[in-house]
Amino acid sequence: MPSDLEKPTIIYPCVWDYRVIMTTNDTSVLKELLETYQRPFKLELKNTSKNAKFYSFNVSMEVSNEAERNEIFQKISQLEVVAHAL
């Protein structure tokens, strides 16, 4: 298990990328969540599974600090249409 000394140094604010695997290609719920942060974001469809069961999106947005970065990750992960977030 990595120690705190091995954690990468991240300088905030910075643009952070999240990979979001969803069960629908309708991004309205995800966009609604991201818009609550009142800053620009980029949302791109990256991949669709062979049977169109899952859709992979890349979300990029500026985060102010580690706490905010983790909060956004948690909120994205808790959306009903999200199968997995990275």
From Swiss-Prot:
Gene3D superfamilies for the chain: 3.30.70.260
A Pfam family recorded for this sequence: DUF493
Family annotation (InterPro entries): UPF0250_YbeD-like, YbeD-like_sf
Family: To C.jejuni CJ0253.
Protein name according to UniProt: Uncharacterized protein jhp_0447
